[in-house]
UniProtKB/Swiss-Prot annotation:
<keyword id="KW-0564">Palmitate</keyword>
<dbReference type="GO" id="GO:0003774">
    <property type="term" value="F:cytoskeletal motor activity"/>
</dbReference>
<feature type="lipid moiety-binding region" description="S-diacylglycerol cysteine">
    <location>
        <position position="22"/>
    </location>
</feature>
<comment type="function">
    <text>Assembles around the rod to form the L-ring and probably protects the motor/basal body from shearing forces during rotation.</text>
</comment>
<comment type="similarity">
    <text>Belongs to the FlgH family.</text>
</comment>
<keyword id="KW-0472">Membrane</keyword>
<feature type="signal peptide">
    <location>
        <begin position="1"/>
        <end position="21"/>
    </location>
</feature>
<feature type="lipid moiety-binding region" description="N-palmitoyl cysteine">
    <location>
        <position position="22"/>
    </location>
</feature>
<keyword id="KW-0732">Signal</keyword>
<dbReference type="GO" id="GO:0009279">
    <property type="term" value="C:cell outer membrane"/>
</dbReference>
<keyword id="KW-0975">Bacterial flagellum</keyword>
<feature type="region of interest" description="Disordered">
    <location>
        <begin position="34"/>
        <end position="53"/>
    </location>
</feature>
<keyword id="KW-0449">Lipoprotein</keyword>
<dbReference type="GO" id="GO:0009427">
    <property type="term" value="C:bacterial-type flagellum basal body, distal rod, L ring"/>
</dbReference>
<dbReference type="Pfam" id="PF02107">
    <property type="entry name" value="FlgH"/>
</dbReference>
<feature type="compositionally biased region" description="Pro residues">
    <location>
        <begin position="36"/>
        <end position="46"/>
    </location>
</feature>
<comment type="subunit">
    <text>The basal body constitutes a major portion of the flagellar organelle and consists of four rings (L,P,S, and M) mounted on a central rod.</text>
</comment>
Length: 230
């Protein structure tokens, strides 16, 4: 009885290892790093001089005649998603090869005439033909808006931005993540910028819920798919 128990333990461990190997591996995120950054604490305000009408500290330390475009860590920028890609690829291959060879013996000993009887004359020929074609195409469109936060300012003045939008509907949830580098001069007066003008753009759209589970193959099916040699 003790021997049976000892033998069952490795078998159960092997089955658990196989089941874990067939488990669904979550996809790696495209957007990495922080998705937001709070603004740094303001410096200690100095004593306000009496008689002054405009106080910079009362207006977020912005100059009087400057617009409120984002330029500091913690400011927000609205990204207008306008992504559209079209790609097509086609390939065709045609190859052929023919070959022939003739083998014969001009003279043979007379005592072997009845045995050979011109059987040494041989013709060899062969041919090889291969045809292959392939075609693929992709068409993707992604539109919408997402408001991001400035998480860093580069030495040349460009802004590092990142943001996330999560939407929960019934038992499912969806989220959009975005990160990239923006030139402040590309930001419009309404504090928006097109995603096509963002450098190093990372756009991620994922969903979790019943619809996502339906599109995923079961672990037992994945096991047989991995183990099958066909």
């Amino acid at each position: 009885m003790m021997l049976k128990t000892v033998l069952r333990l490795p078998v159960c461990a092997a089955l658990l290892a196989l089941a874990a190997g067939c488990a669904m591996i979550p996809p790696e995120p495209v957007v990495t790093g922080p998705l937001t950054a709070p603004p740094p604490p303001p410096p200690q305000p100095s004593a306000r001089p009496n008689g002054s009408i405009y106080q910079p500290s009362a207006y977020g330390n912005y100059p009087l005649f400057e617009d409120r475009r984002p330029r500091n860590v913690g400011d927000i920028v609205t990204i207008v998603l306008e992504e559209k890609t079209n790609a097509a690829k086609g390939v065709a291959t045609n190859t052929s090869r023919d070959g022939s060879a003739t083998l014969g013996v001009a003279a043979a000993p007379r005592f072997m005439d009845g045995i050979i009887n011109d059987k040494l004359d041989t013709d060899i020929s062969g041919g090889n033909t291969a045809n292959g074609t392939g075609k693929s195409s992709a068409n993707n469109t992604f539109t919408g808006t997402i408001t991001t936060t400035v998480i860093g300012v580069l030495p040349n003045g460009n802004l590092q931005i990142a943001g996330e939008k999560q939407i929960a509907i019934n038992r499912g949830s969806e989220y959009v993540r975005f990160s990239g580098v923006v030139d402040p001069r590309s930001i419009t007066g309404s504090n928006t910028v097109s995603s096509t003008r963002v450098a190093d753009a990372r756009i991620e759209y994922r969903s979790k819920g019943v619809m996502d589970e339906v599109q995923t193959m079961g672990w037992l099916q994945r096991f047989f798919l991995i183990a099958s040699p066909f």
